[in-house]
Amino acid sequence: TRRQREDGVRTGVRLGYGSYDTWMTEATNQVKKGRFNSIITGSYNRTNGHRPDMEFEQYGGYTRLGYELDHSWNVSADLNLTHFNASNPGTVSTPVFDNDSRITRGMTSFALENRYERTSGALKFFYNWGKHHINDGYGTGEEPLDYRFNSKDRMMGISWYQSASLFSGNRLTAGID
């Protein structure tokens, strides 16, 4: 995502429509006022697919807030969420029934970054999570499954690195995760 360099507000909307009732939409708002900057994006995408039981639908959102502490240091936090529903009919010769997925994923992070003429780096905290509900479906002549794949996951961590250009054409980076 590009940061806005000059003070002001920019808002944009993208809409697309295609065959099989396919929609691709996105709305974005960017703000820069003094040392503060933000971006907020929301999207909705869907299609019926080119075959029965091949639908896909996705909702997404992203937010980033940032603040320049001084010319060389800034802090930021962001959040990215998406949820999608998908159906898979199998192949034409080997159809699958009720093969449906409902998946939600998210990510958030916080960063303290520095940028000088010959060195730059960051301290970052990140957290990712997801919730998955998947029906593997069943084939012709089979019984529907009496269970679902359900999963929840979480991952978090801290990353620190500093990079320096000691001479022209050189960059040395050290860090830990």
Predicted regions and their residues:
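Residues on the lipid-exposed face of transmembrane beta-strands in outer-membrane beta-barrel proteins
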Residues: 27-31, 63-67, 110-114, 158-164
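Transmembrane beta-barrel strands of outer-membrane/channel proteins
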Residues: 13-17, 40-44, 77-83, 123-129, ...
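Outer-envelope beta-barrel architecture signal
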Residues: 7-11, 23-25, 34-38, 59, ...
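Subset of outer-membrane beta-barrel
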Residues: 33, 43, 58-62, 66-68
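Flexible loop and strand-edge segments within Gram-negative outer membrane beta-barrel domains
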Residues: 47-54, 58, 68, 72-122, ...
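Short strand-turn segments of transmembrane beta-barrel domains in outer membranes
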Residues: 2-31, 41-42, 47-54
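C-terminal extensions
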Residues: 16, 70, 137, 143-177
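Transmembrane beta-barrel architecture of outer-membrane proteins
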Residues: 22-24, 58-60, 103-107, 153-161, ...
